Amino acid sequence: MESPEGAGPGEIVKDVKVPQAALNVSAHETGDMCRTPVAEEEEEVGIPIPAPGFLQVTERRQPLSSVSSLEVHFDLLDLTELTDMSDQELAEVFADSDDENLATESPAGLHPLSRASCLRSPSWTKTRAEQNREKQPPSDPERQGTIVDTFLTVEEPKED
């Protein structure tokens, strides 16, 4: 297979055929006597018929809903993932919002439990203690004296 003129031995050259309808050139102007049925229909109706493979926007509509409401939900999701729950003020804010939701959903007479004492990170994230544990080698002496729980990190008393 020979390479076309102007192409080096390692270059790939592709011939791309563009439909005449896309170039707005009729078959008479190019001297091509072979006419397609699509071109004949286009001349009869007066409405350009899009060639296959081309996207043609005929009408614009407003979006069905605002994207901003979705962005708010994703921003809150990111906020909860990246929030340091060891900060007591932030923990209280999240706990208060959970208490409000539970109070509206709980039947009368039942008191919702306070969740401020046990805040759990979402299952799709890892706690910092777990990330640090993965980075440290198993023979590290600091790691041996620490128990990692899903709710909180507690250090065992060291014996002297």
From Swiss-Prot:
List of residues that carry Phosphoserine: S3, S97, S121
Keywords attached to this entry: Phosphoprotein
The keyword Phosphoprotein belongs to this UniProt entry's keyword annotation: yes
GO cellular component entries: cytoplasm
Segments of skewed composition (Basic and acidic residues): 127-143
Pfam families, per database record: Dysbindin
Ranges where the record places region Disordered: 95-160
Family of the protein in this entry: Belongs to the dysbindin family.
PANTHER family: DYSBINDIN DOMAIN-CONTAINING PROTEIN 1, DYSTROBREVIN BINDING PROTEIN 1 DYSBINDIN
Protein name: Dysbindin domain-containing protein 1
